[in-house]
Amino acid sequence: MSSKSRTKLFAAQKKILDTRAASQYNNSVRLQPPKVVTPSKWLTPEYDGRYRGRYLQMAKDAARRHGIPENLFLRLVQQESNWNPQAKSHKGALGLAQLMPQTARLLRVDPLDPAENLEGGARYLKEQYRTFGTWRLALAAYNAGPGAVKKYGGVPPFRETQNYVKVIGGG
């Protein structure tokens, strides 16, 4: 076999091996870097609240840790508690992100600890986003509960929830 033929044979074999290796790599979840899911830029209006205290940075950090648009989470906390860590709703929701006691237990956070409450609120909102696929429906589920969003196949026809989604999401 001539050296020219060997070179062609080697090139052909190398091409086959490269193609196989690329195919195996593309099909291997283990070797691929983790997929980064960037939350959609859901045109959330800028946070325009006056609050600039210590909980603001905690809320921003919690939003970033969980991949939530910062302005969305800041507006949620503003709407939920007006940045009052001792806030308690008529339905029993507690703290900055207004977690229901049973939700806080499931998330294993102390709803009266501001840092844990914000962490729990961000985790819960992200969980709703993963379940429903849009921030609009995640907000509706955060407010009315995931069961209501499932039951109605979208934002429930409750005035409070519709207003909540509109105020936080901007439309």
Language-model features and meaning:
Residues 86-109, 117-125, 140, 146-147, ...:
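Substrate-binding/active-site groove segments that recognize
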Residues 152-153:
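LysM (lysin motif) carbohydrate-binding repeats in extracellular/periplasmic proteins that recognize
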Residues 79, 128, 171:
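Mid-sequence acidic-hydrophobic segments that form the walls
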Residues 1-75, 171:
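Cell-wall glycan-active module
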Residues 125-128, 132, 149:
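Hydrophobic recognition helices of helix-based DNA-binding modules
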Residues 58-60, 64-84, 118-123, 138-145, ...:
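Short, functionally critical alpha-helical segments immediately adjacent to catalytic or ligand/cofactor-binding
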Residues 45-56, 65-66, 70, 89-93, ...:
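Solvent-exposed, acidic/flexible segments
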